[in-house]
Amino acid sequence: MDLVIGGKFKLGKKIGSGSFGELYLGVNVQTGEEVAVKLENVKTKHPQLHYESKLYMLLQGGSGIPNIKWFGVEGDYSVMVIDLLGPSLEDLFNYCNRKLTLKTVLMLADQLLNRVEFMHTRGFLHRDIKPDNFLMGLGRKANQVYIIDFGLGKKYRDLQTHKHIPYRENKNLTGTARYASVNTHLGVEQSRRDDLESLGYVLMYFLKGSLPWQGLKAGTKKQKYDRISEKKVSTPIEVLCKNQPSEFVSYFHYCRSLRFDDKPDYSYLKRLFRDLFIREGYQFDYVFDWTVLKYPQIGSSSGSSSRTRHHTTAKPGFNADPIERQERILGKETTRYKIPGAVEAFSRRHPTTTSSPRDRSRSRNSDDGPFSKQTHGDSERANSSSRYRASSSRKAVAASSSRPSSAGGPSESRTSSRLVSSSGGGGSGSGNGRPSTSQRVQAGYESKTLSFSRATAARNTREDQLRSFELLSLRK
Protein backbone atom coordinates (compact mmCIF):
# COMPACT_ATOMS: atom_id res chain seq x y z
CA MET A 1 0.00 0.00 0.00
CA ASP A 2 1.85 3.08 -1.30
CA LEU A 3 0.24 5.86 0.68
CA VAL A 4 1.36 9.12 2.29
CA ILE A 5 -0.71 10.10 5.31
CA GLY A 6 -1.35 13.74 6.11
CA GLY A 7 1.18 14.79 3.53
CA LYS A 8 4.18 13.57 5.53
CA PHE A 9 3.78 10.04 6.93
CA LYS A 10 4.72 7.33 4.44
CA LEU A 11 3.09 3.98 5.05
CA GLY A 12 5.40 0.98 5.41
CA LYS A 13 4.91 -2.69 6.19
CA LYS A 14 2.08 -4.14 8.23
CA ILE A 15 3.16 -4.89 11.79
CA GLY A 16 -0.08 -5.89 13.49
CA SER A 17 -3.84 -6.27 13.27
CA GLY A 18 -6.81 -6.62 15.53
CA SER A 19 -10.56 -6.77 15.64
CA PHE A 20 -10.74 -3.02 15.09
CA GLY A 21 -8.19 -2.29 12.38
CA GLU A 22 -4.67 -2.82 11.12
CA LEU A 23 -1.35 -1.40 12.25
CA TYR A 24 1.46 -0.34 9.94
CA LEU A 25 4.95 0.95 10.34
CA GLY A 26 5.28 4.47 9.00
CA VAL A 27 7.97 7.09 8.63
CA ASN A 28 7.84 10.87 8.76
CA VAL A 29 9.32 11.80 5.37
CA GLN A 30 10.39 15.19 6.74
CA THR A 31 12.27 13.99 9.82
CA GLY A 32 12.86 10.27 9.23
CA GLU A 33 11.11 9.42 12.51
CA GLU A 34 9.38 6.04 12.57
CA VAL A 35 5.75 6.04 13.69
CA ALA A 36 2.83 3.64 14.05
CA VAL A 37 -0.12 4.08 11.69
CA LYS A 38 -3.48 2.56 12.59
CA LEU A 39 -6.00 2.14 9.77
CA GLU A 40 -9.72 1.45 9.88
CA ASN A 41 -11.93 1.13 6.82
CA VAL A 42 -14.51 3.93 6.80
CA LYS A 43 -17.16 1.36 5.84
CA THR A 44 -16.55 -0.83 8.87
CA LYS A 45 -19.73 -1.89 10.65
CA HIS A 46 -18.63 -0.63 14.06
CA PRO A 47 -16.16 2.24 13.57
CA GLN A 48 -14.19 3.25 16.63
CA LEU A 49 -10.88 4.74 15.51
CA HIS A 50 -12.22 8.30 15.63
CA TYR A 51 -13.48 7.68 19.15
CA GLU A 52 -10.14 6.17 20.15
CA SER A 53 -8.24 9.15 18.74
CA LYS A 54 -10.33 11.48 20.91
CA LEU A 55 -9.35 9.51 24.00
CA TYR A 56 -5.70 9.71 23.01
CA MET A 57 -6.08 13.48 22.71
CA LEU A 58 -7.77 13.69 26.11
CA LEU A 59 -4.97 11.71 27.73
CA GLN A 60 -2.06 13.52 26.08
CA GLY A 61 0.73 14.55 28.43
CA GLY A 62 0.37 11.65 30.83
CA SER A 63 3.28 9.34 31.58
CA GLY A 64 3.06 6.22 29.47
CA ILE A 65 0.53 7.69 27.02
CA PRO A 66 1.66 7.59 23.36
CA ASN A 67 1.69 10.88 21.47
CA ILE A 68 -0.95 11.18 18.78
CA LYS A 69 0.60 12.87 15.75
CA TRP A 70 -2.23 12.97 13.24
CA PHE A 71 -5.80 11.82 12.71
CA GLY A 72 -7.97 12.08 9.63
CA VAL A 73 -9.41 10.30 6.63
CA GLU A 74 -7.27 9.21 3.69
CA GLY A 75 -9.20 7.58 0.86
CA ASP A 76 -11.22 4.68 2.24
CA TYR A 77 -9.52 4.73 5.63
CA SER A 78 -9.71 6.54 8.91
CA VAL A 79 -6.09 6.94 9.98
CA MET A 80 -4.41 7.60 13.31
CA VAL A 81 -0.66 8.22 13.51
CA ILE A 82 0.97 7.77 16.91
CA ASP A 83 4.36 7.06 18.43
CA LEU A 84 5.99 3.75 17.60
CA LEU A 85 6.47 1.57 20.66
CA GLY A 86 8.33 -1.60 21.54
CA PRO A 87 7.09 -5.08 22.44
CA SER A 88 3.96 -5.74 24.45
CA LEU A 89 4.12 -7.35 27.86
CA GLU A 90 2.58 -10.43 26.24
CA ASP A 91 5.51 -10.59 23.80
CA LEU A 92 8.01 -10.23 26.63
CA PHE A 93 6.15 -12.78 28.76
CA ASN A 94 6.51 -15.29 25.91
CA TYR A 95 10.17 -14.36 25.47
CA CYS A 96 10.73 -15.18 29.16
CA ASN A 97 9.21 -18.67 28.74
CA ARG A 98 5.80 -17.56 30.02
CA LYS A 99 6.70 -16.83 33.61
CA LEU A 100 8.05 -13.69 35.25
CA THR A 101 9.87 -13.31 38.54
CA LEU A 102 8.30 -11.54 41.49
CA LYS A 103 10.79 -8.70 41.13
CA THR A 104 9.83 -8.03 37.52
CA VAL A 105 6.10 -8.29 38.27
CA LEU A 106 6.37 -5.81 41.15
CA MET A 107 8.35 -3.32 39.05
CA LEU A 108 5.68 -3.60 36.37
CA ALA A 109 2.81 -3.40 38.87
CA ASP A 110 3.91 0.04 40.05
CA GLN A 111 3.81 1.45 36.52
CA LEU A 112 0.64 -0.39 35.53
CA LEU A 113 -1.24 0.98 38.53
CA ASN A 114 -0.03 4.47 37.63
CA ARG A 115 -1.32 4.11 34.07
CA VAL A 116 -4.75 2.92 35.15
CA GLU A 117 -4.97 5.61 37.83
CA PHE A 118 -4.11 8.30 35.29
CA MET A 119 -6.90 7.20 32.95
CA HIS A 120 -9.33 7.22 35.85
CA THR A 121 -8.30 10.74 36.91
CA ARG A 122 -9.16 11.86 33.38
CA GLY A 123 -12.64 10.41 33.80
CA PHE A 124 -12.27 7.26 31.67
CA LEU A 125 -12.21 3.50 32.13
CA HIS A 126 -10.04 1.34 29.87
CA ARG A 127 -12.25 -1.79 29.96
CA ASP A 128 -9.72 -4.01 28.18
CA ILE A 129 -6.81 -4.37 30.60
CA LYS A 130 -4.56 -7.18 29.34
CA PRO A 131 -0.84 -7.78 28.62
CA ASP A 132 -1.27 -7.03 24.90
CA ASN A 133 -2.37 -3.48 25.73
CA PHE A 134 0.75 -2.53 27.68
CA LEU A 135 3.87 -1.88 25.60
CA MET A 136 7.42 -0.97 26.52
CA GLY A 137 8.97 2.14 25.04
CA LEU A 138 11.94 2.45 22.70
CA GLY A 139 15.45 3.77 23.18
CA ARG A 140 15.68 5.95 26.26
CA LYS A 141 12.09 5.05 27.14
CA ALA A 142 12.72 1.30 26.91
CA ASN A 143 12.00 0.87 30.64
CA GLN A 144 8.73 2.79 30.58
CA VAL A 145 5.38 1.00 30.25
CA TYR A 146 2.80 2.53 27.89
CA ILE A 147 -0.93 1.86 27.86
CA ILE A 148 -2.64 1.61 24.47
CA ASP A 149 -5.86 0.64 22.69
CA PHE A 150 -8.57 2.90 24.06
CA GLY A 151 -11.22 1.73 21.60
CA LEU A 152 -13.31 0.18 24.39
CA GLY A 153 -12.71 3.05 26.82
CA LYS A 154 -15.71 4.67 28.41
CA LYS A 155 -16.33 7.87 30.34
CA TYR A 156 -17.49 6.93 33.84
CA ARG A 157 -18.14 10.44 35.14
CA ASP A 158 -18.96 13.89 33.85
CA LEU A 159 -15.79 15.97 33.64
CA GLN A 160 -17.52 19.08 34.99
CA THR A 161 -19.95 17.79 37.60
CA HIS A 162 -18.02 14.59 38.44
CA LYS A 163 -21.34 12.76 38.52
CA HIS A 164 -20.76 9.02 38.22
CA ILE A 165 -22.53 6.93 35.59
CA PRO A 166 -25.51 4.98 36.99
CA TYR A 167 -25.35 1.37 38.12
CA ARG A 168 -26.82 -0.98 35.52
CA GLU A 169 -27.10 -4.70 34.90
CA ASN A 170 -27.65 -7.00 31.92
CA LYS A 171 -24.68 -5.48 30.11
CA ASN A 172 -22.78 -7.30 27.38
CA LEU A 173 -19.27 -8.48 28.15
CA THR A 174 -16.91 -5.79 26.95
CA GLY A 175 -13.19 -6.55 26.92
CA THR A 176 -11.24 -9.81 27.11
CA ALA A 177 -12.89 -12.71 28.92
CA ARG A 178 -9.66 -14.06 30.41
CA TYR A 179 -9.01 -10.86 32.37
CA ALA A 180 -12.58 -9.58 32.84
CA SER A 181 -13.76 -8.96 36.39
CA VAL A 182 -16.36 -11.22 38.00
CA ASN A 183 -18.98 -8.50 37.85
CA THR A 184 -18.29 -7.86 34.17
CA HIS A 185 -19.06 -11.54 33.51
CA LEU A 186 -22.26 -11.14 35.50
CA GLY A 187 -23.46 -8.29 33.31
CA VAL A 188 -22.79 -5.42 35.73
CA GLU A 189 -21.83 -2.03 34.30
CA GLN A 190 -18.06 -1.57 34.63
CA SER A 191 -16.47 1.04 36.86
CA ARG A 192 -13.01 1.77 38.26
CA ARG A 193 -12.95 -1.34 40.43
CA ASP A 194 -13.18 -3.57 37.33
CA ASP A 195 -10.06 -2.16 35.64
CA LEU A 196 -8.16 -2.85 38.86
CA GLU A 197 -9.48 -6.39 39.23
CA SER A 198 -8.47 -7.09 35.62
CA LEU A 199 -5.01 -5.75 36.39
CA GLY A 200 -4.78 -8.18 39.30
CA TYR A 201 -5.47 -11.09 36.92
CA VAL A 202 -2.70 -9.81 34.63
CA LEU A 203 -0.22 -9.83 37.53
CA MET A 204 -1.19 -13.38 38.55
CA TYR A 205 -0.92 -14.49 34.92
CA PHE A 206 2.65 -13.19 34.85
CA LEU A 207 3.57 -14.85 38.15
CA LYS A 208 1.95 -18.23 37.60
CA GLY A 209 2.21 -18.59 33.84
CA SER A 210 -1.52 -19.07 33.34
CA LEU A 211 -4.90 -18.55 34.98
CA PRO A 212 -7.23 -21.37 36.15
CA TRP A 213 -9.86 -20.54 33.51
CA GLN A 214 -7.51 -20.76 30.52
CA GLY A 215 -7.85 -23.57 28.01
CA LEU A 216 -11.49 -24.38 28.74
CA LYS A 217 -13.23 -26.08 25.84
CA ALA A 218 -16.70 -25.14 24.59
CA GLY A 219 -18.77 -25.41 21.44
CA THR A 220 -19.50 -21.71 20.99
CA LYS A 221 -17.96 -18.45 22.10
CA LYS A 222 -20.89 -17.78 24.44
CA GLN A 223 -20.49 -21.21 26.04
CA LYS A 224 -16.78 -20.56 26.47
CA TYR A 225 -17.49 -17.23 28.19
CA ASP A 226 -19.99 -19.04 30.42
CA ARG A 227 -17.38 -21.61 31.42
CA ILE A 228 -14.76 -18.93 32.09
CA SER A 229 -17.27 -17.03 34.22
CA GLU A 230 -18.24 -20.12 36.22
CA LYS A 231 -14.61 -21.06 36.86
CA LYS A 232 -13.68 -17.51 37.84
CA VAL A 233 -16.60 -17.15 40.25
CA SER A 234 -15.90 -20.52 41.87
CA THR A 235 -12.15 -20.01 42.33
CA PRO A 236 -11.40 -18.57 45.80
CA ILE A 237 -8.90 -15.74 45.87
CA GLU A 238 -6.64 -17.79 48.14
CA VAL A 239 -6.58 -20.59 45.56
CA LEU A 240 -5.94 -18.15 42.71
CA CYS A 241 -3.02 -16.65 44.66
CA LYS A 242 -1.69 -19.92 46.08
CA ASN A 243 2.09 -19.89 46.71
CA GLN A 244 2.20 -16.14 46.06
CA PRO A 245 2.74 -13.36 48.63
CA SER A 246 -0.32 -12.46 50.70
CA GLU A 247 -0.27 -8.93 49.26
CA PHE A 248 -1.91 -10.30 46.12
CA VAL A 249 -4.72 -11.79 48.20
CA SER A 250 -5.16 -8.40 49.88
CA TYR A 251 -5.19 -6.71 46.47
CA PHE A 252 -8.06 -8.86 45.18
CA HIS A 253 -10.07 -8.62 48.39
CA TYR A 254 -9.76 -4.85 48.24
CA CYS A 255 -10.79 -4.59 44.57
CA ARG A 256 -13.79 -6.89 45.00
CA SER A 257 -14.97 -5.06 48.11
CA LEU A 258 -15.25 -1.72 46.33
CA ARG A 259 -18.74 -0.46 45.63
CA PHE A 260 -19.74 0.47 42.09
CA ASP A 261 -18.99 4.19 42.41
CA ASP A 262 -16.18 4.04 44.99
CA LYS A 263 -12.95 5.84 44.22
CA PRO A 264 -10.18 3.25 44.72
CA ASP A 265 -7.29 4.00 47.05
CA TYR A 266 -4.57 3.64 44.43
CA SER A 267 -1.90 4.68 46.93
CA TYR A 268 -2.84 1.79 49.21
CA LEU A 269 -2.52 -0.70 46.36
CA LYS A 270 0.83 0.67 45.23
CA ARG A 271 2.06 0.67 48.82
CA LEU A 272 1.12 -3.00 49.17
CA PHE A 273 3.48 -3.93 46.37
CA ARG A 274 6.19 -1.39 47.20
CA ASP A 275 6.44 -2.64 50.77
CA LEU A 276 6.68 -6.21 49.49
CA PHE A 277 9.37 -5.16 47.03
CA ILE A 278 11.46 -3.59 49.78
CA ARG A 279 10.91 -6.48 52.16
CA GLU A 280 12.19 -8.89 49.50
CA GLY A 281 15.39 -6.85 49.27
CA TYR A 282 15.03 -5.96 45.60
CA GLN A 283 16.58 -2.94 43.90
CA PHE A 284 14.37 -0.91 41.57
CA ASP A 285 17.04 -0.95 38.86
CA TYR A 286 14.83 -1.65 35.83
CA VAL A 287 16.64 -4.93 35.25
CA PHE A 288 13.63 -6.94 34.08
CA ASP A 289 13.69 -10.66 33.31
CA TRP A 290 13.94 -9.98 29.57
CA THR A 291 16.89 -7.65 30.23
CA VAL A 292 18.76 -10.47 31.96
CA LEU A 293 17.95 -12.92 29.16
CA LYS A 294 19.14 -10.52 26.48
CA TYR A 295 22.13 -9.18 28.44
CA PRO A 296 23.23 -11.77 31.03
CA GLN A 297 26.10 -9.51 32.09
CA ILE A 298 23.58 -6.99 33.40
CA GLY A 299 22.12 -9.54 35.77
CA SER A 300 25.51 -10.53 37.15
CA SER A 301 26.67 -6.92 37.35
CA SER A 302 23.61 -5.82 39.26
CA GLY A 303 24.01 -8.64 41.74
CA SER A 304 20.77 -10.29 40.69
CA SER A 305 19.74 -13.46 38.96
CA SER A 306 16.51 -13.95 37.06
CA ARG A 307 14.97 -15.96 39.90
CA THR A 308 16.56 -14.65 43.10
CA ARG A 309 16.66 -11.57 45.24
CA HIS A 310 19.17 -8.79 44.87
CA HIS A 311 21.97 -9.05 47.41
CA THR A 312 23.58 -5.66 47.55
CA THR A 313 25.05 -3.23 49.98
CA ALA A 314 22.78 -0.48 48.72
CA LYS A 315 19.57 0.08 50.61
CA PRO A 316 16.82 -1.93 48.88
CA GLY A 317 13.75 -0.25 47.52
CA PHE A 318 12.38 2.28 45.09
CA ASN A 319 14.91 5.01 45.80
CA ALA A 320 17.97 3.08 44.67
CA ASP A 321 19.88 4.35 41.63
CA PRO A 322 17.68 2.96 38.84
CA ILE A 323 19.87 1.80 35.95
CA GLU A 324 23.40 3.01 36.54
CA ARG A 325 24.91 -0.46 36.17
CA GLN A 326 22.76 -1.14 33.17
CA GLU A 327 24.00 2.09 31.58
CA ARG A 328 27.62 1.03 31.95
CA ILE A 329 27.01 -2.27 30.23
CA LEU A 330 24.64 -1.21 27.48
CA GLY A 331 26.46 1.98 26.60
CA LYS A 332 24.79 3.69 23.69
CA GLU A 333 22.84 0.60 22.70
CA THR A 334 19.40 1.71 21.55
CA THR A 335 16.83 -0.81 22.71
CA ARG A 336 14.77 -1.21 19.54
CA TYR A 337 11.89 -3.59 19.03
CA LYS A 338 9.51 -4.46 16.24
CA ILE A 339 6.04 -6.00 16.46
CA PRO A 340 5.19 -8.78 15.77
CA GLY A 341 8.10 -11.03 16.75
CA ALA A 342 9.30 -8.06 18.73
CA VAL A 343 12.00 -9.56 20.87
CA GLU A 344 13.30 -11.95 18.23
CA ALA A 345 13.63 -9.11 15.74
CA PHE A 346 15.37 -7.04 18.36
CA SER A 347 17.87 -9.86 18.96
CA ARG A 348 18.64 -10.14 15.27
CA ARG A 349 19.11 -6.40 14.79
CA HIS A 350 21.13 -5.83 17.95
CA PRO A 351 23.82 -8.39 18.79
CA THR A 352 25.03 -8.16 22.37
CA THR A 353 27.89 -5.71 22.50
CA THR A 354 29.28 -3.75 25.39
CA SER A 355 32.00 -1.70 23.75
CA SER A 356 30.14 1.61 23.49
CA PRO A 357 30.57 4.32 26.13
CA ARG A 358 27.74 4.97 28.52
CA ASP A 359 24.92 7.09 27.20
CA ARG A 360 21.77 5.42 28.38
CA SER A 361 19.19 7.68 29.93
CA ARG A 362 17.64 6.92 33.28
CA SER A 363 14.08 6.09 32.36
CA ARG A 364 11.64 6.66 35.17
CA ASN A 365 7.91 7.14 34.85
CA SER A 366 8.25 10.35 32.87
CA ASP A 367 6.50 11.70 29.84
CA ASP A 368 5.64 10.38 26.48
CA GLY A 369 6.76 7.66 24.06
CA PRO A 370 5.92 5.42 20.99
CA PHE A 371 3.33 2.63 19.78
CA SER A 372 2.58 -0.77 18.32
CA LYS A 373 0.24 -3.72 18.88
CA GLN A 374 -0.17 -7.43 18.29
CA THR A 375 -3.34 -9.43 18.59
CA HIS A 376 -3.01 -12.93 20.01
CA GLY A 377 -5.37 -15.72 19.03
CA ASP A 378 -5.99 -16.79 22.61
CA SER A 379 -7.07 -13.38 23.86
CA GLU A 380 -10.81 -14.20 23.91
CA ARG A 381 -11.71 -10.56 23.30
CA ALA A 382 -15.39 -9.87 22.87
CA ASN A 383 -15.78 -7.55 19.90
CA SER A 384 -18.81 -5.60 18.91
CA SER A 385 -20.02 -8.23 16.43
CA SER A 386 -20.20 -11.00 19.03
CA ARG A 387 -21.07 -9.80 22.50
CA TYR A 388 -21.86 -12.05 25.40
CA ARG A 389 -24.93 -11.27 27.46
CA ALA A 390 -24.80 -12.56 31.00
CA SER A 391 -27.50 -15.12 31.68
CA SER A 392 -30.16 -14.06 34.13
CA SER A 393 -29.47 -17.10 36.29
CA ARG A 394 -26.10 -15.61 37.28
CA LYS A 395 -27.19 -12.00 37.42
CA ALA A 396 -25.50 -9.87 40.05
CA VAL A 397 -27.50 -9.35 43.22
CA ALA A 398 -28.08 -5.63 43.48
CA ALA A 399 -29.03 -3.68 46.54
CA SER A 400 -29.23 0.05 46.96
CA SER A 401 -27.09 1.60 49.63
CA SER A 402 -27.04 5.13 50.93
CA ARG A 403 -23.72 4.80 52.78
CA PRO A 404 -21.62 7.79 51.75
CA SER A 405 -18.43 6.95 49.91
CA SER A 406 -15.42 8.02 51.90
CA ALA A 407 -13.35 8.53 48.78
CA GLY A 408 -15.51 10.16 46.17
CA GLY A 409 -16.25 13.84 46.18
CA PRO A 410 -19.69 15.13 47.16
CA SER A 411 -20.76 15.16 43.55
CA GLU A 412 -20.16 11.46 42.97
CA SER A 413 -23.23 9.27 42.85
CA ARG A 414 -24.07 7.37 46.01
CA THR A 415 -25.87 4.57 44.19
CA SER A 416 -24.06 1.33 44.88
CA SER A 417 -24.57 -2.38 44.65
CA ARG A 418 -23.72 -5.64 46.30
CA LEU A 419 -21.34 -7.76 44.32
CA VAL A 420 -21.57 -11.47 43.85
CA SER A 421 -18.99 -13.38 45.85
CA SER A 422 -16.26 -15.19 43.98
CA SER A 423 -13.95 -16.01 46.84
CA GLY A 424 -13.89 -18.68 49.41
CA GLY A 425 -12.74 -16.57 52.30
CA GLY A 426 -10.62 -13.77 53.64
CA GLY A 427 -6.90 -13.28 53.68
CA SER A 428 -4.70 -11.36 55.98
CA GLY A 429 -3.31 -7.91 55.68
CA SER A 430 0.37 -7.24 55.54
CA GLY A 431 0.90 -4.75 58.33
CA ASN A 432 2.61 -1.37 58.12
CA GLY A 433 -0.62 0.49 58.72
CA ARG A 434 -2.45 -1.24 55.87
CA PRO A 435 -5.88 -2.64 56.69
CA SER A 436 -5.92 -6.38 57.27
CA THR A 437 -8.21 -8.56 55.23
CA SER A 438 -10.18 -9.31 58.37
CA GLN A 439 -11.21 -5.66 58.28
CA ARG A 440 -12.36 -6.18 54.71
CA VAL A 441 -15.60 -7.85 53.76
CA GLN A 442 -15.77 -11.32 52.27
CA ALA A 443 -14.52 -10.97 48.72
CA GLY A 444 -17.23 -9.67 46.43
CA TYR A 445 -19.69 -8.59 49.15
CA GLU A 446 -20.33 -5.12 50.39
CA SER A 447 -20.11 -4.14 54.03
CA LYS A 448 -21.61 -1.22 55.88
CA THR A 449 -18.58 -1.27 58.16
CA LEU A 450 -16.19 -0.74 55.30
CA SER A 451 -13.71 1.74 56.69
CA PHE A 452 -10.80 2.19 54.32
CA SER A 453 -9.52 5.71 54.22
CA ARG A 454 -9.54 7.13 50.70
CA ALA A 455 -6.96 9.49 49.35
CA THR A 456 -8.53 12.81 48.35
CA ALA A 457 -8.24 13.24 44.60
CA ALA A 458 -6.18 16.18 43.39
CA ARG A 459 -8.16 18.74 41.41
CA ASN A 460 -7.85 18.06 37.71
CA THR A 461 -5.81 20.98 36.43
CA ARG A 462 -6.65 20.27 32.82
CA GLU A 463 -10.45 20.25 33.20
CA ASP A 464 -10.96 23.42 31.22
CA GLN A 465 -8.97 22.01 28.32
CA LEU A 466 -10.89 18.75 28.46
CA ARG A 467 -14.37 20.29 28.46
CA SER A 468 -14.20 20.80 24.71
CA PHE A 469 -14.55 17.02 24.47
CA GLU A 470 -17.67 16.87 26.63
CA LEU A 471 -19.83 16.40 23.54
CA LEU A 472 -17.79 13.33 22.63
CA SER A 473 -20.12 10.51 21.61
CA LEU A 474 -19.55 7.83 24.21
CA ARG A 475 -20.20 4.10 24.28
CA LYS A 476 -23.52 2.96 25.68
From Swiss-Prot:
It catalyses: L-seryl-[protein] + ATP = O-phospho-L-seryl-[protein] + ADP + H(+); L-threonyl-[protein] + ATP = O-phospho-L-threonyl-[protein] + ADP + H(+). Residues 357-367 have a biased composition (Basic and acidic residues). It comes from the Eukaryota. It is found in: Cytoplasm. Residues 299-324, 340-464 are annotated as: Disordered. One of its GO terms (molecular function) is protein serine kinase activity. Autophosphorylated. Residues 9-278 form the Protein kinase domain. GO terms for cellular component: cytoplasm; stigma papilla. Keywords: ATP-binding, Cytoplasm, Kinase, Nucleotide-binding, Serine/threonine-protein kinase, Transferase. Pfam families: Pkinase (PF00069). InterPro entries: CK1_Ser-Thr_kinase, Kinase-like_dom_sf, Prot_kinase_dom, Protein_kinase_ATP_BS, Ser/Thr_kinase_AS. Its EC number is 2.7.11.1. Residues 382-422 have a biased composition (Low complexity). ATP binds at residues 15-23, 38. Signal peptide: none annotated. Residues 423-432 have a biased composition (Gly residues). Transmembrane segments: none annotated. The active site is at 128 (proton acceptor). Monomer. PANTHER family: CASEIN KINASE-RELATED. Casein kinases are operationally defined by their preferential utilization of acidic proteins such as caseins as substrates. It can phosphorylate a large number of proteins. This is Casein kinase 1-like protein 7.
